[in-house]
Amino acid sequence: MDQEQEFLQSLSGLRDQLLDVLKDYWIFSIPYSLGEVAIAGALAKSFKQQYGGPLAFLVDPAKMGVAQLFADQVDVAVPVPMHLLRNLNRRGFLSPETFRRGSVQDAYEIHGAKLNFVSLVTLRNQHPDRGLPVTDVFRFAMRLPWEAPLHPGRPDKEALEQAERIAASVGMEPGNSVILFPGNNTNLPAPSVFWKRVAKEAAAAGKRVFVNVSGAALLPDDLDVPGIPVELNDIPQAIALCEIAGRIVAGSNGFLMTALLTETRFGLDVILTDAFDPTASGRHYQPMPIRSGSLFLQAPEIKEDIDRPYREWEVPSSVDTESIAVDLVRAWSAGNGSPS
């Protein structure tokens, strides 16, 4: 038996094991990033209202924290490495046409049915009046009506208590602090000069400034951004700590989508850039329409439901980013930061 055959045999064994353990569950495989797990989690209640339970999610171990935010609706979350989940689909081990308990469904792309839903999302990003937003792609894959509502998740008591301990240990002023997230995962991070100016202006405005650099694959060249360092690796704790701080500034990514789909109210300033690296290595950047990073394009219903200070800022590579940083901080005192 060659290596390929051994791998296929292991995938078959994994599928059979999952189906045996979860034979009475609706099972959704979500082999993607934080935001995708959060969207599926936010639709879990609507799914169970439509089809009943119990409901199981298969997610990468690093994304289990997102599933925990929706523990009141997702009955069990099973950690399975992302590459195995993706190969279960790509190698034809899933049966998307069999929609019932005890059959694994992919909550986003159904390669086995020769459908690539990401193409619909790409069209949406390029032309906002065309294609489907990410949230509707999930509704379609989960066989929900277009009007199925998103239900926010929440950090549990343990995460809230741990966040309070962290906040006290680093001297965070509740409601008067800002956490900067200079890094990103696929979208190009804004340059360090932008982040330094945001930190400077925020401090001058009386904010306690914190800088998180953990959990990001892509970082600006110079990370000497003034601020108190914090490491936010646990997703529920990180969201709870952001709520204590009162505001964050970050590039468009799955963490922000996750945060928007929780019962929190901290302010969000989202940085949109004009390139991305699908390999997340920092060596293969490709240009992209700057608005494609807009969370409102990906989940337009959140613009109607949002109840927090929120702004999106376009920071293209060819402009004076320091002036944008100044405007960003000044906007905090200009109003409540209604969606833009």
Question: Where would I find each of the regions flagged by the language model?
Answer:
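Active-site and donor-binding regions of nucleotide-sugar-utilizing enzymes
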Residues: 2-129, 237-247, 255-258
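Structural beta-sheet core signal
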Residues: 27-28, 56-57, 180, 211, ...
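Conserved catalytic-core segment of nucleotide-activated headgroup transferases in glycan assembly
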Residues: 37-50, 185-212, 313
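Donor-binding and catalytic core of enzymes assembling or modifying cell-surface/extracellular glycoconjugates
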Residues: 65, 190-276
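Active-site regions of enzymes building and remodeling cell-envelope glycoconjugates
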Residues: 70-80, 219-232, 284-299, 307-313
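A short acidic, often aromatic-flanked loop/helix-cap motif at beta-alpha or helix-coil junctions
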Residues: 80-101, 125, 155-160, 218, ...
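Mid-sequence helix-capping/hinge segment at a functional interface
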Residues: 116-189
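Nucleotide-sugar donor-binding patch of glycosyltransferase catalytic domains
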Residues: 260-340
